[in-house]
């Protein structure tokens, strides 16, 4: 079985531990914040935290959905922490970030699916951090474009929403979300003309190259200009197993194909994640 195959050398990483890593950890924990770095068991956490960067996760640490690739806790979330937007903004200031990335759990339990909390967070980041550029990685808000408009009007510099996987695998990989709803969200962002629309996908779940290229074409047709492609890694036994480890050479091939197809920016390598080197995606 694929899950018993030894992890290849190119996926073995050194966990960070310098002074900047410790400082970042202290700031995050001191403000009682959540990051996708820890909840998602991101392989780049050592590198990013050692550079003083982190991807903040708002809305709490419990998601209302149960996507089979994701390690974030799922269940009934706690009430929103109204101080969270300010805590995130202050942490960005303390870290001295020039570019910040914020994502969230899905909050399908709320009437607005968390959109108002998103807007408050963006506004607080802008108020406290003059000159900082901001990327937001948003949920699909169940296809409610009026809620997507709230995020657009708050004016982050980049709005990202991940397709995650190819059309065929979406029902077995993602929870509640659909491929076409995600495309519609991306199209709506791009059509606003106010900021780049960005998406990301994982490889190694059993997709074919033909399906990957179809996703690229669908994303481009929706107006997406930035795409990230990385290797899926099984975060725990309850998650989907890895079907295949994609080689660095295959990732580079896809990067070149994506450039030829017309993406303005494409990151494609085994350890690439949506927010990895996000400052390049403005």
From Swiss-Prot:
Question: Which residues are noted in the entry as [4Fe-4S] cluster 1-binding?
Answer: 37, 42, 48, 275
Q: Which Pfam families does this chain map to?
A: Radical_SAM
- Molecular-function GO term, any one: 4 iron, 4 sulfur cluster binding
What cellular-component terms does GO give this entry? cytoplasm
Q: Where in the cell is it found?
A: Cytoplasm
Give yes or no: UniProt keyword Cell division: no
Could you list this entry's UniProt keywords, alphabetically sorted: 4Fe-4S, Cytoplasm, Iron, Iron-sulfur, Metal-binding, S-adenosyl-L-methionine, Transferase
Under the heading CDD domains, the entry gives:
Radical_SAM
State where [4Fe-4S] cluster 2 binds: 63, 67, 70
What coarse category fits the chief subcellular location reported for this protein?
cytoplasm
Residue limits of the Radical SAM core domain?
49-264
Q: Which Enzyme Commission number(s) are listed? A: 2.8.1.8
Record keywords: Magnesium included?
no
Q: Which Gene3D superfamilies match?
A: Aldolase class I
Catalytic activity of the protein? [[Fe-S] cluster scaffold protein carrying a second [4Fe-4S](2+) cluster] + N(6)-octanoyl-L-lysyl-[protein] + 2 oxidized [2Fe-2S]-[ferredoxin] + 2 S-adenosyl-L-methionine + 4 H(+) = [[Fe-S] cluster scaffold protein] + N(6)-[(R)-dihydrolipoyl]-L-lysyl-[protein] + 4 Fe(3+) + 2 hydrogen sulfide + 2 5'-deoxyadenosine + 2 L-methionine + 2 reduced [2Fe-2S]-[ferredoxin]
Needed cofactors, names only, are:
[4Fe-4S] cluster
Pathway per its UniProt entry is: Protein modification; protein lipoylation via endogenous pathway; protein N(6)-(lipoyl)lysine from octanoyl-[acyl-carrier-protein]: step 2/2
Q: What domain of life does the UniProt record list for this protein's source?
A: Bacteria
The note on the cofactor says:
Binds 2 [4Fe-4S] clusters per subunit. One cluster is coordinated with 3 cysteines and an exchangeable S-adenosyl-L-methionine.
Q: Which HAMAP family match?
A: Lipoyl_synth
Q: Which PANTHER family match?
A: LIPOYL SYNTHASE (PTHR10949), LIPOYL SYNTHASE, MITOCHONDRIAL (PTHR10949:SF0)
For this chain, the family text in UniProt reads:
Belongs to the radical SAM superfamily. Lipoyl synthase family.
**What name does UniProt use for this protein?**
Lipoyl synthase
Q: What is the lineage of its organism?
A: Bacteria, Pseudomonadati, Bacteroidota, Bacteroidia, Bacteroidales
- Encoded by which gene? lipA
